[in-house]
């Protein structure tokens, strides 16, 4: 055996140690923001690739099929970091002490609105009075704008949507939009960002639906991490997200997202209060 060969073999264990450390995947997850899982992966993978590269790890990205599932995965420590809706984050925080690192900005704003859309031919001058008895599709129970906030608002009006309407739930937001546009249901829950994205992508025409209700401004999606994540990794992820400026966001984030701002202790307080009010987390 040559001296060079012996030297290489002697160094091999030392070289393998950092390689193994760097080979631990960063387990990321994102909810069903786009019409299909493939669409969501294509839109959000560049952002998660940026995070993984920033912390020196390979990427393992999961696209969930519903909003509740992403909260469960984070709570069960199957995921390290997730881009998730506000209500999903609160569920994971309540169940397993998940922590929000940052709040996403959309067109420079950290807020959005829940909406209820209707078929454009329906005579709805007053909502919900004129819509009583109509069919309505809610999103799954892990959705902020598609489930929690509409349920909470109806509760403040003394209305149970399950008996006031012909009620169903469990749909994705894109599916809700298309169900209204094609006349499968009269009404559906959604959020303003999604409706705008569907129209911009040509999946929906603006004249195929009309908005009959809007919520107050809600905090945008969270970049959240699981409990007991290494503090150094958590700090590096936060810095990687907050370091994205508008120019970088245009390359690595979906259209119209412009970066992140730090999450504060009260960033999602209104979502947590709504969850308690409808009895979905403790203290309601």
Regions found by a protein language model. Name each.
Residues 59-65, 163-172, 210-213:
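Short beta-strand-to-loop elements that line the ligand-binding cleft
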Residues 138-153, 241-284:
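Ligand-binding clefts/hinges and TM-proximal coupling segments of bilobed small-molecule sensing domains
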Residues 25-54, 87, 110-177, 187, ...:
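Bilobed "Venus flytrap"/periplasmic-binding protein-like clamshell domains
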Residues 29-33, 106-115, 203-241, 255-274:
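Periplasmic-binding protein-like
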Residues 68-82, 95, 129, 173-193:
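Short helices/loops that flank or line small-molecule/ion binding pockets
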Residues 71-130:
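Acidic, polar ligand-binding/catalytic clefts
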Residues 7-21:
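N-terminal export signals
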